[in-house]
Each structure stands twice: as C-alpha cells, then as structure tokens.
C-alpha cells in the first residue's frame, strides 16, 4: 500500500525551501512553529506517512543555522496553566522543551515572556532561566490591540517591548502550548 505522504521528500523539500527563504531575506528568517514539534500524533494520524517528529527532524537538518525562541504568556505562569496532554504546567514545559532541544543539539537562544505582568511567579521563572544561562525578554500587553494600530506601532506599543537579540539566520519561535 502506498502512503499518502512521503516523509523523506517532505524533510528534503521543506529544509531546502527554508534555506532559500533565508537567502531571500538577507540571511534572517523568522518562523513560527505552531503545533507540536515532538510527538505530533494527530498529524501522523491524519497524514499517513507523516512521522510524529517530522518537524523536529526537519529542524535538525538546519540546526547549525537555527536558533529557538520559546514564548510563554505571563498569565500562563501566574495561573499555573496545565498542558492537558502532559499534565505539567506551561512553565515546567518550557524547561522541558529547553532540555529536549539542547539534548538534540539545537540552540535555544532565549525565552520571551509575553503579556508581561510583574508577579512573583513570573520573576522567579525568569530568575530560574537566567541562572542557567537562558536569556529572557519581556513583551508587554498593548492596550487597544489589535484595533488601535497607531498605538500598537508607537513607542508605547511594540516600541515598549524588549528587543529579542538573535544570532543565527533561522529564528524558530515556538511555545509550550496553545494561547501562550
């Protein structure tokens, strides 16, 4: 029986297209990876031939060029939001992801705390990351988002956010789960 999806071809084509896009954009490409990078059993069920770790395998082909930025909402840290599939909080999942990525030779450049709110839980999380050498950046709530475009693009909107410094040509943005 022929499978409906050629995983090897996918990996080869996707990584080649990403390399081409990096070259097109002056050697800097930002990609958001939604969904699971590890254990994507849903995708492998609905696309026979797609392997549960296909996205990760594709990233590994680009690991010398790739830098990962993990994003987590301050609200998810404060509320101790739990992943339904793993039963762990989002902040613990960020730590798990860092270990997993680094264990595979991928570079985690930083963690960005979005919707930043000063709270002991958030500051303890940032301190924990900084103490193990992971840089953290803060992005703030923007009043009027997404409708007040003038405010959003002002110094009090996006301009208030800390600039996330990156060093590699491919910046992969991911999160511990939906909504973060």
Q: Which stretches of residues belong to each language-model region?
A:
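A short, charged/proline- and glycine-enriched loop
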Residues: 24-28, 165-170
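Short, glycine/acidic-rich beta->alpha junctions
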Residues: 51, 121, 164, 178-179
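Glycine-rich phosphate-binding P-loop
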Residues: 168-179
